[in-house]
Amino acid sequence: MSFDSLDLCPELLSAIATQGYTTPTPIQAQAIPVIFEGCDLLAGAQTGTGKTAAFALPIVQMLSEVNPRKKHRIPRALVLVPTRELAAQVSEQMQNYGRRLSLRSTKIYGGVNIRAQIERLHRGIDIVVATPGRLLDHAERGTIKLSEVEFLVLDEADRMLDLGFIDDILKVVEYLLLTRKVTSSTKALENKQKQKVL
């Protein structure tokens, strides 16, 4: 199988080729078509298997195809991650793919000055990669709008649960429009948390 067979646009195929990749990994080959179909997805893959590209590529492409860019951009994709290090890594990949399709992304996490994050959000962002706590901080301050989020990704969800982020994640979902994707993700988390308690 090649990346050409995954219905990716020329801009993203070029980005992939620039990175030196020629063949999709198993997680990419399985996940990308499912995401393109608009289905919810629960997937697991080890670090280094191309997991981020598996969700980033189809999301970036679909964001560029639907809802033409508005003058003032509001986030339409949200990726929650457990740590600032992972936020930086995922955000970098989102930027690499998104810039080829004129999409803007940013990372949001604690331990740094919030003012610079507020300024970036104010300029308009399509994709936000965030840790749950700092995202909630922005939501409660009113410095981020989550009403138009179409895609929610919980990256390393098990680790977020292990770190005790379940309540924060559920609060984040309260700020989102309750689409099928969000509701399904929330139910899965609630069930997982119940299993951990039992």
Q: Locations of the language-model features?
A:
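Conserved pre-motif I regulatory segment
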Residues: M1-G44, A54, D155
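Conserved nucleic-acid-binding Ia/Ib motif block in the N-terminal RecA-like helicase ATPase lobe
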Residues: S5, P10-Y21, P68-E140, E148-F151
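Nucleotide phosphate-binding site architecture
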Residues: T22, L42, V60, A87, ...
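Walker A/P-loop NTP-binding motif
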Residues: A29-L41, T52-K71, A88, E92-Y97, ...
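Pre-Walker A (Motif I) flank of P-loop NTPase domains
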Residues: E37-A43, P75-A77, I125-D126, K192-Q195
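The conserved Walker
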Residues: A45-T49
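Post-DEXD/H (motif II) to motif III coupling segment of the RecA-like Helicase ATP-binding lobe
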Residues: K145-L154, D158-L198
